[in-house]
From Swiss-Prot:
Taxonomic path: Eukaryota, Fungi, Dikarya, Ascomycota, Pezizomycotina
Reported phenotype of the disruption mutant: Nearly abolishes the transcription of FMAN_15221 to FMAN_15223 under PKS8-inducing condition.
Location of this chain's protein in the cell: Nucleus
Keyword NAD: no
Protein's name according to its UniProt entry: Transcription factor
Organism of provenance: Fusarium mangiferae (Mango malformation disease fungus)
Purpose of the protein: Transcription factor; part of the gene cluster that mediates the biosynthesis of fusamarins, isocoumarin derivatives that show moderate cytotoxicity with IC(50) values between 1 and 50 uM. Positively regulates the expression of the fumsamarins cluster genes.
Gene: FMN4
Length: 394
């Protein structure tokens, strides 16, 4: 970008600039570009003080260059330029600068840097703006540690990101896949840390329980979003609609994430069971200390464990309602306080003749046994609660 309408140095008079301008204009009109006329006394002094003049010119050019780029710089604000034209007797629309003593490479670098910033701000992918809303959309009305209830609305990014009527955007599906994989990775890390021999017992405020809650909540939002996409695809009455919409891989990723969450739930139950066993041995060894309760012990109290187990049951029920939505189920009462277990009426993998040795057969058996896994986990939680009740009675 060239810098125009600038005096190179305050020592140059308007008369010298006007003379150079007239000489250059005459050369252009005649069509012959002659050698520039001899420099005046002021111009000779400029070349003697070239470093100082170059710095002044760069400073002035940078200032005017930034001003002329403003949107408010128009003909109405060009009062200073009009007065300068009257003083010099020429038009400032012509190129009348002495380019020999100006370092244009620095101006070019500055212009490229500014254009690079503008291009960087314009090239932001608009699809990525939903990342923050997707992960924190529901967090606005849920405080940390607050649990779900049946009336809590589940918001999805469909209100911020438009989903095509016939097919989901590849960027949208990629974003959901990345978030599901992130949930699975964090869940695996939490499970590994909890299974460490020196890990602290899980409490309501521990990082393991927080990851179980946050991971389940994020997974539920993703499942609800995918359900919207699948419902729109199936409404077209096309047999290839769902298979071609690109959600098959995402569905498997979601199921893998659900398995990791179940692994974390089981690890929490195992850690609580280990703490209960230790407390039971301590109670047996010190029978004289019957008056002490778990609340006064350094280890977490039974109330802490009870709240954690109740949260796990709540999260399992939440996953049940999302995973088995629209599937014909047969309710059956289990041993845990009359909680209804959702048992699928479809045949399992063995009845379908699937090969459990293959990855597809194993995956099919895992999918058909999801409700059974949830049922067994509820039974484990119920047994732990019974052990805690017995321990408090000792």
């Amino acid at each position: 970008m060239r810098c125009r309408h600038v005096r190179l140095a305050p020592t140059c008079s308007a008369r010298c600039l006007t003379a150079n301008h007239a000489s250059a204009a005459g050369s252009r009109k005649s069509g012959v570009f002659e050698t520039p006329p001899p420099r005046s006394h002021h111009q000779a002094s400029l070349y003697q003080n070239a470093p100082n003049v170059s710095r002044q010119a760069q400073h002035v050019c940078t200032t005017v260059w930034s001003i002329t780029r403003r949107s408010c710089f128009n003909s109405e604000n060009s009062i200073g330029l009009s007065s300068l034209e009257k003083q010099t007797g020429g038009s400032l629309e012509d190129d009348w600068l002495d380019y020999d003593s100006f370092n244009w490479s620095q101006t070019s670098t500055m212009a490229q840097a500014d254009l690079g910033l503008e291009n960087a701000s314009q090239n932001i992918d608009p699809d990525l703006k939903m990342s923050h809303d997707f992960m924190a959309g529901v967090d606005a009305h849920l405080d940390e540690g607050q649990w779900w209830d049946d009336t809590t609305p589940i918001q999805t990014p469909s209100s911020n990101v438009e989903i095509s009527d016939d097919r989901a955007s590849p960027n949208f599906l990629q974003e959901l896949t990345s978030q599901a994989m992130a949930v699975g990775t964090k869940t695996i890390s939490a499970t590994t840390a909890l299974l460490h021999p020196n890990s602290a017992p899980p409490t309501v405020s521990s990082q393991y329980v927080n990851q179980a809650f946050d991971g389940t909540r994020s997974l539920v939002r993703i499942i609800n979003t995918i359900s919207i996409i699948i419902s729109r695809e199936t409404d077209e009455n096309s047999s290839e609609a769902v298979s071609c919409c690109g959600v098959g891989g995402l569905a498997l990723t979601i199921l893998a994430c659900q398995q990791h969450l179940l692994g974390l739930f089981k690890a929490i139950c195992k850690s609580i069971e280990h703490c209960i066993d230790e407390k039971s041995r301590e109670k047996t060894a010190f029978e004289t200390n019957h008056s002490s309760s778990l609340m006064g012990d350094p280890a977490p109290s039974s109330a802490q464990f009870t709240m954690v187990l109740q949260l796990l049951v709540h999260l399992i029920n939440r996953l049940d309602r999302c995973l088995f939505a629209g599937i014909q189920t047969m309710p059956s009462t289990n041993e845990y306080q009359g909680v209804m277990d959702l048992t699928r009426t479809e045949k399992n993998g063995d009845e379908l003749g699937s090969d459990r040795a293959s990855i597809s057969g194993f995956a099919q058996g895992s999918i058909t046994g999801l409700s059974e896994q949830h049922h067994r986990l509820r039974q484990i939680i119920s047994q732990l609660q019974g052990q805690m009740d017995t321990l408090e009675e000792i």
